[in-house]
Design a protein with these regions (language model features):
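Helicase motor core with emphasis on the C-terminal RecA-like subdomain
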Residues: 1-10, 14-18, 22-44, 51-56, ...
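Short, low-complexity, intrinsically disordered N-terminal peptides in bacterial proteins
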Residues: 1-2, 476, 535-536
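A generic structural motif
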Residues: 30-32, 56, 290, 497-499, ...
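ABC nucleotide-binding domain signature
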Residues: 59
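Residue-level detector of conserved, well-ordered beta-strand and adjacent loop positions
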Residues: 89, 262, 374, 493, ...
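C-terminal accessory region of SF2 helicases/translocases
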Residues: 282, 308-317, 323-495, 499-513, ...
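Intrinsically disordered, low-complexity, charged/polar segments
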Residues: 519-536
């Protein structure tokens, strides 16, 4: 059966997009692949359709249980054994987990959904390896990159874990990954000569609008104007949990029934709200960034941000939830200059070097579980996870058997490890803050917003997008494929900031992402006249 025929007979799809086909063919040839496609462009199909044709089960690694549940339900409602999916997670009992393994082993199910945490258990890894998986699909692959906006330390071990189950071909999927994040994904997952498919990040059905608000009252009136004009459902993103609760109450009192959602709510309550929103029972959801992954809802008519997001990465991911049905949708950013200070506050403080040193010393003594380390150090789960991630990145920690963590054989001394981890944390904070600066530049630009946003992700648009407020107001100017002294995506070096990658040109400016200091916008004229950059 061909890919197109499988898509038609198993999923009822009449056609596949060219970028989907390119990625699927790589999977069919048993090649590793990295796929960057916009939200709603059918990324899941890229592993699901080939998996139905390739002998052997497929392991799907995904960060959120809600995201897994939606994909499992979508596969199982088709009632075909070659599409049946099972799951191993903290939500399943030991009996259910054993039954899932049995179903895969006996050929009654094709897809095994699992989290990195479950796969890191050596006994579980051995069970999965014995199934001889034919393919590994990694959803939300940008979570593995410390360059990314949604970094998850438990993803760091995936390269090691995939080796542990026999290193089958890997397809890594994400909706948002700038060039350095793509490079990081390839390196950390140890992808071998992967097929890289990056396509179609422009969303022509989204009208992108930004308004700088002089007062809170103006911000409120702009929101109400949109709610009065537009149909439901929609999502309003706010920066804090308190803001979510207060705005939902204020909207409801004003005659616009709304619910709030944030990470501080009980798991059960969040799940109920998630399901209610998908079922069109919640017309307006006011949420923090905790509401996002797993929201596969095609008819979201608008997305509003009530403050400046922390980065173009987050913004792009969140606005991508609108208009997945292809119908016109609005995305509106209402921001104030004070939002930048708030995001700098959220980027947090730096780790304590003494705590890092003590933790590194413990790991050198003997491997321990996270529970044991929490009891010994007194560190909370979040801080411990951050510290272990930093120590792993500087070669002072590594996963061991029985869910333990230890120090590599030739790890640095605790003092050196702590200093290196602190330096890495400082670098990450600098990069994070530079992303906020890029977000502000996007909000303030009078140029085409589509060009500006895609340039951040390393995509050059030679024509204006035609679907943003600046294009509508006539301030956008086509850059005619602006070029400069260095090719886009070339590696360059600055005498002070070190190595970097050229991302884009816009009029007389160029954007470069430096490893040490993050995103910088430079004058092309000054770079050329003063020889500030050299090819690396």
């Amino acid at each position: 059966m061909t890919l197109r025929r499988a898509a038609r007979s198993l999923f009822g799809w009449k056609a596949l997009r060219p970028n989907q086909l390119a990625a699927m063919r790589a999977v069919m040839k048993r090649r590793d692949a990295l796929v960057v496609l916009p939200t709603g462009a059918g990324k899941s199909a890229i592993y699901q359709i080939p998996a139905s044709l390739i002998p052997g089960p497929t392991v799907v690694i995904s960060p959120l249980l809600a995201l897994q549940q939606d994909q499992i339900a979508s596969l199982n409602e088709r009632q075909r054994p070659e599409l049946r999916a099972v799951r191993i997670s903290s939500n399943e009992s030991p009996t259910q987990q054993a039954e899932a393994i049995t179903e895969i082993r006996e050929g009654r199910a094709e897809f095994l959904f699992i989290t990195p945490e479950q796969l890191s258990n050596p006994d579980r890894m051995a069970e999965v390896a014995a199934l001889k998986p034919a393919l590994v699909a990694i959803d939300e692959a940008h979570c593995i990159s410390a360059w990314g906006h949604d970094f998850r330390p438990d993803y760091l071990a995936l390269g090691h874990l995939i080796d542990g189950i026999g290193r089958p071909p890997v397809v890594a999927l994400t909706a948002t990954a700038s060039p350095p994040v793509r490079d990081d994904i390839i390196a950390r997952l140890r992808l071998r000569d992967p097929e890289v498919v990056v396509s179609g990040l422009d969303r022509p059905n989204l009208f992108v609008e930004v308004a700088q608000c002089a007062t809170e009252d103006y911000r409120w009136r702009r929101l109400i104007a949109l709610l009065s004009d537009d149909e439901r459902p929609g999502i309003i993103y706010v920066p804090t949990r308190r803001a979510a609760e207060e705005l939902a109450t204020r909207l409801t009192d004003a005659g616009y029934p709304a619910q709030f959602y944030h990470g501080g709510m009980a798991t059960g309550a969040r799940h109920e709200l998630h399901e209610a929103f998908l079922a069109d029972q919640v017309p307006i959801m006011v949420a923090t960034s905790a509401f996002g992954m797993g929201i596969d809802k095609p008819n979201i008519a608008w997305v509003v941000h009530m403050a400046l997001p922390d980065s173009p990465d987050s913004y792009f991911q969140e606005i991508g939830r609108a208009g997945r049905d292809g119908q016109p949708a609005r995305v509106l950013l209402l921001w104030q200059a004070e939002d930048v200070g708030l995001q700098r506050f959220f980027s947090g403080g730096l780790p304590d070097v003494d705590e890092l040193r003590d933790l590194a010393a413990l790991l050198r003594k003997k491997p321990a579980t996270k529970t044991e380390l929490r009891e010994t150090t007194g560190l909370g789960p979040r801080k411990l996870g951050q510290y272990l991630s930093l120590l792993e990145q500087v070669g002072a920690a590594e996963p061991r058997a029985r869910q333990r963590i230890g120090a590599p054989r030739y790890s640095p001394t605790p003092t050196d490890a702590a200093a290196a981890a602190l330096a890495e944390a400082e670098r990450q904070q600098t990069v994070t803050r530079s992303r906020t600066d890029m977000m502000r530049a996007f909000a303030e630009t009078t140029a085409c917003r589509g060009q500006t946003l895609l340039a951040y992700f390393g995509e050059q648009m030679t024509q204006v997008c035609g679907h943003c407020d600046n294009c509508h107001n006539g301030t956008s100017v086509a850059d005619q494929g602006a070029v400069g002294p260095f090719p886009v995506h070339s590696q360059v070096r600055h005498p002070e900031w070190g190595p970097g990658m050229v991302l884009s040109y816009e009029e007389d400016k160029m954007t470069v992402l430096f490893e040490e200091v993050g995103y910088k916008t430079l004058s092309v004229r000054v770079v050329s006249e003063q020889g500030l950059l050299t090819l690396d």
